[in-house]
Amino acid sequence: MDYSYDEDLDELCPVCGDKVSGYHYGLLTCESCKGFFKRTVQNNKHYTCTESQSCKIDKTQRKRCPFCRFQKCLTVGMRLEAVRADRMRGGRNKFGPMYKRDRALKQQKKAQIRANGFKLETGPPVGVPPPPPPPPDYMLPHGLHASEPKGLASGPPAGPLGDFGAPALPMAVPSAHGPLAGYLYPAFPGRAIKSEYPEPYASPPQPGPPYGYPEPFSGGPGVPELILQLLQLEPDEDQVRARIVGCLQEPAKGRPDQPAPFSLLCRMADQTFISIVDWARRCMVFKELEVADQMTLLQNCWSELLVFDHIYRQIQHGKEGSILLVTGQEVELTTVAAQAGSLLHSLVLRAQELVLQLHALQLDRQEFVCLKFLILFSLDVKFLNNHSLVKEAQEKANAALLDYTLCHYPHCGDKFQQLLLCLVEVRALSMQAKEYLYHKHLGNEMPRNNLLIEMLQAKQT
């Protein structure tokens, strides 16, 4: 469905620079790019580029290379899922509220620009110190600033690396069990995953859990019991960071050279996902499900959980000119723009827009843990053996989030609905991220034994 926009915003089509005619397929675009995108998707067209897949797309040359034009449509954020498959006029109605929300945010941003000169793509923060000398086994790519997070030493963490000590992820599990088997299955298959660490997770048993968990949260009045329990399940961020850094500092076997920046990012994402799997295994309801249901749920939402983890880290980071990695290092947006390539750069900027939306909504930690729980128990899942238990978990989480927002943010009566709309954008972002990863995989650019690619392949089989 198309939506009008306000003329005073002076928007130009992000694909070709022509005058915008309205909201089309998730974005303000011109009429020409709207029609081109719709025809391409509905007719399942496949284009090729006769040049180097980097043709300039503007108002005068937009018809010259349909391949690069369509890639630019996807890069700037036009959404495949918004195009109707039945060839009827109008997009999918479910995107209407998101368009209206986006329009309101653009109006708000326009007012901010007029009042404060605020822009998303600001330069690096003033006074950022130069990066310190990197540790010997973990070279920092150019453009990364190694900060000193609280509780994280500059060198490798003291003591054994424990469950995440191996730099290369163990993939020696039966393919029939899927890529998560080594991280989910306890010693005896067919049992639900216990909250304790299973035997395959670490060869020598170690005393105590690998992560420190905070003291029970005293939320005071108006904090539902479910949210209190979820807060207690959140791992200590400093210990997670130290464990991931320690893993990255260990050189991979057979690869004495320093890894490329993209390979490092993939390993960071792998280790972050392993910590997310551990969190899921400790969650109420999830640990009561059969292993098959647990794997189905995680295979459905793994990319959304990773994206949402990144988004919340940026909200805590609070700097528009850089992004914060899970290792505590800062990457300037100017570095991303110069070195990351157009697809990854567009992903980062789209994520930054969502960071701004959630920051404007004043997302707090209580809402974050509840939304993460909702993502884990997404009802957009088929072939579950215990669908009723998952449905009950989602209903309880929805009720807890609604009660919390009404109690603590009474001045923003629709905050609950706005937060759920943001989850739609998280899913769209995760879909674009998976397409990017698979594109890199087809180009043989992904590191070996990458868990994320195995997750992608498991989803397709």
UniProtKB/Swiss-Prot annotation:
According to UniProt, the name of this protein is Steroidogenic factor 1
- Phosphoserine occurs at S203
Q: Which residues form the signal peptide?
A: none
Keyword Flavoprotein annotated: no
Native species: Bos taurus
Q: Does the keyword Hydrolase apply?
A: no
Chain positions covered by the region annotation Disordered: 116-158
Where, by residue number, does a 1,2-diacyl-sn-glycero-3-phosphocholine bind? G341, Y436, K440
Ranges of Pro residues composition bias in the record: 126-138
Q: Which part of the chain engages DNA, per the record?
A: 10-85
Q: Sorted alphabetically, which Pfam families does this protein's record hold? A: Hormone_recep, zf-C4
Q: Where is this region: Important for dimerization?
A: 230-461
| Keyword annotations of the record | Acetylation, Activator, DNA-binding, Isopeptide bond, Lipid-binding, Metal-binding, Nucleus, Phosphoprotein, Receptor, Transcription, Transcription regulation, Ubl conjugation, Zinc, Zinc-finger
Modified sites of kind N6-acetyllysine: K34, K38, K72
Listed GO biological process terms = adrenal gland development; female gonad development; hormone metabolic process; hormone-mediated signaling pathway; Leydig cell differentiation; luteinization; maintenance of protein location in nucleus; male gonad development
ZnF (NR C4-type) ranges: 13-33, 49-73
